[in-house]
């Protein structure tokens, strides 16, 4: 983060100059659409579905990036400052968002959509790897992947709906209607997950990175993660225990995520004759994803993958 902090001073100067050159009109006055930036993809998807034609939503993350190591450029920071709204999960879950807010705060509105979630609804980090030094953004002791739980995702979608109504009350009825359609889809996904996990051949899912804790908790299966929340690698003792467990249970699949690489997982997979299955953590899209992908479409693909891992 040192390089990121060093660039804040010139960024703030550029933002101030851009503000001075603005002839007194806001972006919203020049363009009726609400300009939105988000961190993880689900927030962008929800903003687009609720806001419809009245919003232009973008995610800050390039396709396929590992969000643990992403840092915005100076140009990115200026774009964020010119937006009407910046949506992120929370200061704890999105450390990069906190840095962006410190740099451009006062130029854009910021919505921490996951702040509505009660503390007792959050998952503590329970991975028992030895401590390792690693670069990037440390998510601390709480699992940030709240969006993978469709019930918690609905709470965040409602926060986005309320903020859009605040910014553009003339479209309130449209936002309410669009939110209700989205909420109905999220209820359906919750029910599909409940049904899929009601009676399974296995009770554990092996995955390359600790990211499905909320799904495991709500739908009553065990997550066995090879790398921790911040991609910290397992100790030799943990590694041996994981390999032994895979062989004892005759596990057939290890889930890989679309934007996270793990050489340790590759080694385990090849040494245990398990097959890789791609699980989409939804944090970012990749070049392989359809341009019209939504939270719902990706989660339904995940339901199929989880069903395969829990039943084959």
Annotate each predicted stretch with a short phrase.
Residues 1-18:
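Sec-dependent bacterial lipoprotein signal peptides
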């Amino acid at each position: 983060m040192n390089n990121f902090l060093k660039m804040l001073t010139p960024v703030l100067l550029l933002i101030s100059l851009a503000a001075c050159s603005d002839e007194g009109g806001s972006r919203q006055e020049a363009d009726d659409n609400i300009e939105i930036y988000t961190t993880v993809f689900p927030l962008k998807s929800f903003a687009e579905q609720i806001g419809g034609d009245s919003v232009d939503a973008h995610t800050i993350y390039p396709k396929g990036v590992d969000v643990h190591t992403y840092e915005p450029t100076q140009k990115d920071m200026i774009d964020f400052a010119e937006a009407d709204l910046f949506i992120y999960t929370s200061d704890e879950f999105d450390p990069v968002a906190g840095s962006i807010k410190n740099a451009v705060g006062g130029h854009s509105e910021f919505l921490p959509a996951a702040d509505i979630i009660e503390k007792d609804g959050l998952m503590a980090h329970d991975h028992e790897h030895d401590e390792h030094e690693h670069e990037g953004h440390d998510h601390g002791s709480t699992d940030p992947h709240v969006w993978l739980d469709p019930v918690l995702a609905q709470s965040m979608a409602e926060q986005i709906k309320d903020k859009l109504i605040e910014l553009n009350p003339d479209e309130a009825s449209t936002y309410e209607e669009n939110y209700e359609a989205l909420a109905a889809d999220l209820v359906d996904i919750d029910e599909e997950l409940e049904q899929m996990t009601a009676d399974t051949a296995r009770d554990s899912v092996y995955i390359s990175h600790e990211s499905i804790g909320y799904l495991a908790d709500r739908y009553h299966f065990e997550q066995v993660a090879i790398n921790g929340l911040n991609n910290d690698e397992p100790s030799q003792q943990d590694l041996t225990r994981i390999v032994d467990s895979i062989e004892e249970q005759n596990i057939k699949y290890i889930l890989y995520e679309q934007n996270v690489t793990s050489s340790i997982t590759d080694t385990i997979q090849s040494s245990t004759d398990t097959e890789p299955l791609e699980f989409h953590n939804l944090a970012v899209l990749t070049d392989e994803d359809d341009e019209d992908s939504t939270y719902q479409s990706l989660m339904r693909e995940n339901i199929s993958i989880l069903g395969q891992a829990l039943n084959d």
